[in-house]
A protein has these predicted regions:
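Active-site-proximal helix-loop-helix substrate-binding element of RNase H-like nuclease domains
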Residues: 2-127
């Protein structure tokens, strides 16, 4: 929950290997808002991961409220209390910025926050 590795897919071979692993592994994957990343995975591989959970959908189910401001499920909104403000400008999301330390920190923090949220929800549901 506090350490992450960020893999930079800076060539087609690595990109292909990682995407193939994502859609073929039997290991359960935890995503927050697979709708976003899943679009890219599906576009490149014409399928989605075999076994995954989406922490955003689960959070929305648990927090559901007619007033959407009372059921916000964005990762930064839900985990900001623990990880602070880690968002970066959308200008950073380009191939030119893939080695930018701020973007790498953002990616690592997103991963840690997703796992932490998943663990918190799982523990809540066990009680």
């Amino acid at each position: 929950e506090s350490e992450a590795y960020v893999f930079i897919l800076d060539n087609p071979e690595i990109h292909s290997v990682v995407l193939d692993w994502i859609v073929t592994t039997e290991i359960k994957q935890i995503w927050h808002n697979l709708c976003f990343d899943g679009k890219h995975i599906y576009y490149n591989r014409k399928r989605l991961p075999k076994d995954y959970e989406d922490s955003q959908i689960l959070a929305k189910t648990l927090l559901n409220h007619v007033d959407n401001t009372k059921s916000a499920t964005g990762l930064k909104h839900l985990m900001g209390y623990k990880f602070g403000a880690w968002a970066v400008s959308s200008d950073f999301f380009s191939l030119d910025q893939m080695y930018n330390p701020d973007l790498l920190h953002y990616a690592a923090t997103d991963s840690c926050a997703t796992l932490t949220l998943w663990n918190e929800i799982s523990n809540y549901l066990k009680d």
